[in-house]
Amino acid sequence: MKRRTARERAMQALYQMDITGELEPKIAVENTLDEGEETNEFLESLVVGFVENKEVIDEAIRQNLKKWKLERISIVDRSILRVAVYEMKYMEEIPHNVTINEAIEIAKTFGDEESRRFINGVLSNIKDTL
């Protein structure tokens, strides 16, 4: 599985967890996989890592929102931000610009017209604080 695909699946897993409020990370990951597709370490580390660091990640996002509340952001955008912020804060081997570009590409696919600009702005602000 390519890293872009893993990031997309991680976003989808966080989306499911946000909607249900109680789904286990491993089950959420399994629900995103196509038939016969297997998970990989990168995908699982994104989802489990977010769950383990949810408060820190959400606070980093909150502090970089202008005129927005985290709870008012679309679930898709919130999930994309959460995956990207986890990656930026805890996966130091991945350059921040790569993470931001990947998040923007995922936003183009799954978000609305404004998603990519919004996500780019928030992640760029967060990058400056790391």
From Swiss-Prot:
For this UniProt entry, the molecular function terms from Gene Ontology, in alphabetical order, are: RNA binding
Listed under GO cellular component are: cytosol
Q: Does the keyword Transcription regulation apply?
A: yes
Provide the GO biological process annotations: DNA-templated transcription termination; transcription antitermination
* Alphabetized UniProt keyword annotations: RNA-binding, Transcription, Transcription antitermination, Transcription regulation
Q: Which family does it belong to?
A: Belongs to the NusB family.
Q: What name goes with this protein? A: Transcription antitermination protein NusB
Species assigned in the record: Bacillus cereus (strain ATCC 10987 / NRS 248)
Q: Which gene encodes it?
A: nusB
